[in-house]
């Protein structure tokens, strides 16, 4: 086995620079350039119910700023994510969800969801709390209708 590991390392070192641009292209679901906006269909599912809506995220030089609005136009939450400190800050949360323990869970889950979206995954599930998050990008075709 050790004899093959040298060859595997050599092959990986040769192919990695060639494959990295292909893997990185188009995988992230987050806005990639400063000033870019992205829209997402949002679904938050819990055992006793769920919420759906739309999220708009804007990227600037420090991080991401987002706001989630439900189907009736009521703001569920607005947040910001700072790249340097890798932290999510909740600016406002819907009244019935504005409890310290819910805010803490939302903050942690949004951070993990944003990491997953950067890796190309549109969903995140908090198995401990039984909460599922889904942020599906809205394409240009859907918004022009």
Regions found by a protein language model. Name each.
Residues 46-61, 65-68, 73:
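Structural recognition of beta-strand segments within beta-rich domains
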Residues 22-26, 33, 51, 61, ...:
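Intrinsically disordered, low-complexity segments enriched in small/polar residues
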Residues 34-41, 61-67, 119-124:
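Short, hydrophobic/aromatic-rich segments at coil-to-beta transitions
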Residues 25-29, 41-47, 56, 74, ...:
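Mature, soluble, non-transmembrane domains
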Residues 2-4, 19-25:
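Extended interaction regions within the primary functional domain
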Residues 10-21:
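Bacterial N-terminal signal peptides
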Residues 2-12:
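Bacterial N-terminal signal peptides that target proteins for export
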